[in-house]
């Protein structure tokens, strides 16, 4: 078969995913097949009849549809594909997490970076701090209260949002 999910160590056992192989999604990891996350394999199964024409795009140029960012599993012992919608999947219900700094005050006139001390992890525990978007600003030359809202979305399209009040004193 051209398309298939990442291998499992046991037949019909959703918690037996070869997690190290899952983390190779998006790389040259097999002998010519296209390995997929469960959700992608299921979409093809549900939407593409047998005999559907497949065009393989292999080039150093920008791809016409873009290349999806694969999710990685941080804990290789869990053994589940994070995109599997089975009810027992421990990734179900997990969302990204944003951690904010404890200090929320700035001295008048000090430089302030609204991203300092702000971190984020995805639904699988991977660092996605570089994907954080901030809404708002701090004008450190003017006393007052400033609200910054941080948002992040992971490769599973799950989101988190946290707000922080910064005092310029």
Predicted regions and their residues:
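A generic structural motif
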Residues: 57, 121, 151-153
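Exported/periplasmic cell-wall-interacting domains
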Residues: 1-94
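Serine/threonine-rich, repeat-prone extracellular segments and beta-strand-based repeat modules
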Residues: 126-155, 159-168
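A structural connector/turn signal
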Residues: 31, 43, 101, 135-136
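Solvent-exposed, low-complexity, repeat-rich "mucin-like" stalks and linkers
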Residues: 92-126
């Amino acid at each position: 078969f051209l398309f298939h999910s990442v291998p499992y160590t046991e037949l019909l056992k959703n918690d037996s995913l070869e997690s190290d192989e899952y983390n190779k999604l998006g790389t040259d990891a097999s002998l010519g097949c296209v390995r997929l996350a469960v959700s992608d394999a299921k979409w093809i199964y549900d939407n593409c009849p047998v005999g559907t024409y497949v065009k393989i795009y292999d080039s150093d140029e920008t791809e016409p549809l873009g290349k999806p960012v694969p999710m990685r599993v941080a804990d290789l012992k869990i053994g589940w594909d994070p995109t599997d919608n089975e009810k027992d999947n421990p990734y179900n219900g997990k969302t990204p997490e944003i951690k904010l700094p404890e200090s929320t005050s700035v001295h008048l006139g000090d430089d302030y970076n609204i991203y300092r001390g702000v971190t984020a992890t995805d639904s699988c525990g991977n660092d996605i701090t570089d994907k954080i978007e901030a809404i708002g600003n701090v004008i450190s030359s003017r006393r007052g209260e400033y609200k910054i809202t941080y948002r992040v979305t992971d490769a599973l399209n799950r989101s988190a949002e946290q707000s922080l009040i910064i005092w310029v004193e």
